[in-house]
């Protein structure tokens, strides 16, 4: 029944505690071959004709990009799929496509001129990093220290 399901959900929610550790933004980047895109503010519609590099399916990052494009009326169909953000950067640096990358990690390659930022009309939402722990179970000393360290960072 629906009532039993609601009770179960509330019990599970009480059992887990979510601690916000921080947030970050992703930016759209490209290699030097795509410098014309960095010269103006682009729309998602305009970018549909360019090859996209993305993380593979079944990642929260990929899910966010699918949702972002869908919310603006466009499908997200990357041309190249990789398993890590480092691989994304390498392919983008070698002009194999454009893609999203964490802003903080893009700072140095941007300064060195290895990549360019493409500014978007449709802003990408911030990403949030959270720690979820089972509040009903005792934590080991090592786990407590790890959590304290993560919260301080």
Segments (PLM) and residue ranges:
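Short secondary-structure boundary segments
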Residues: 9-11, 32-33, 103-105, 122, ...
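Short, small-residue-biased leader/transition segments that mark boundaries at the very start
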Residues: 1-8
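Hydrophobic residues within well-ordered alpha-helices
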Residues: 2, 47, 90-96, 131
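Secondary-structure junction motif
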Residues: 36-38, 51-72, 139-143, 147
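Short beta-strand->loop
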Residues: 17-27, 112-125
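Flexible hinge/capping segments at coil-to-helix
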Residues: 13-52, 56-57
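A late-sequence structural motif
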Residues: 116-153
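Hydrophobic hinge/microswitch elements
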Residues: 66-118
């Amino acid at each position: 029944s629906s009532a039993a399901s609601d009770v179960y959900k509330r019990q599970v929610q009480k059992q887990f505690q979510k601690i916000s550790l921080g947030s970050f933004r992703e930016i759209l980047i490209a290699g030097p071959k795509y410098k014309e895109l960095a010269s103006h503010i682009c729309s998602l519609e305009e970018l549909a004709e360019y090859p996209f590099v993305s993380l593979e399916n079944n990642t929260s990052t990929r899910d966010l990009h699918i949702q972002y494009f869908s919310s603006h009326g466009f499908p997200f169909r990357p041309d190249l799929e990789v398993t890590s953000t480092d691989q994304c950067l390498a392919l983008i640096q070698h002009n194999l496509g454009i893609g999203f990358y964490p802003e903080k990690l893009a700072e140095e390659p941007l300064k060195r001129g290895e990549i360019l930022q493409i500014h978007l009309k449709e802003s990408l939402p911030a990403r949030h990093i959270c720690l979820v722990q089972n509040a009903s179970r005792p934590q080991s000393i090592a786990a407590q220290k790890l959590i304290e360290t993560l919260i301080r960072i």
